[in-house]
Design a protein with these regions (language model features):
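C-terminal-biased regions
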Residues: 1-42, 54-127
Length: 127
């Protein structure tokens, strides 16, 4: 009788372990991207436009490397929205639109925070 419960318990344990790992990995990744965007914002405020564009490009490349994982574990709309925000931010940096870029970077950092929050292992997200 007890042996019958072992496979379902093992499956539940594997799901819990993956959920905890995914939550930590998502938080670490989004924190890294948000820090990169904060650095780009600081460079923009210093009016170092080539460095701003390079920092955004580097952050976008880092983001792009995680697209497969993000589309597997996150809501597609949230990931697609962040993707569009990255592209708009890079366009604003290329055009040297400081006020538009600043607003877009703030929105993008908030979107990344929400991505991490959606994947956080919590009662709110479980229910």
């Amino acid at each position: 009788m007890k042996k019958a419960f072992l496979p379902p318990i093992a499956v539940l344990e594997a799901i819990l372990t993956f959920s905890l790992w995914n939550s930590r990995a998502m938080t670490a990744s989004t924190d890294r991207w948000r820090n990169q965007l904060q650095q780009a914002d600081a460079l923009m405020q210093a009016e170092s436009w080539p460095d701003t564009a390079a920092a955004l490009s580097k952050s976008y490349e880092d983001w792009a490397q995680c697209q497969t994982w993000l589309h597997i574990v996150s809501e597609h709309d949230a990931v697609d929205d962040a993707e569009a925000m990255y592209r708009r931010a890079m366009a604003f940096a290329a055009a040297r639109e400081s006020s538009e870029l600043r607003a877009e970077l703030a929105d993008l950092r908030d979107q990344l925070r929400l991505l991490a929050e959606m994947e956080r292992f919590s009662i709110k997200n479980v229910l």
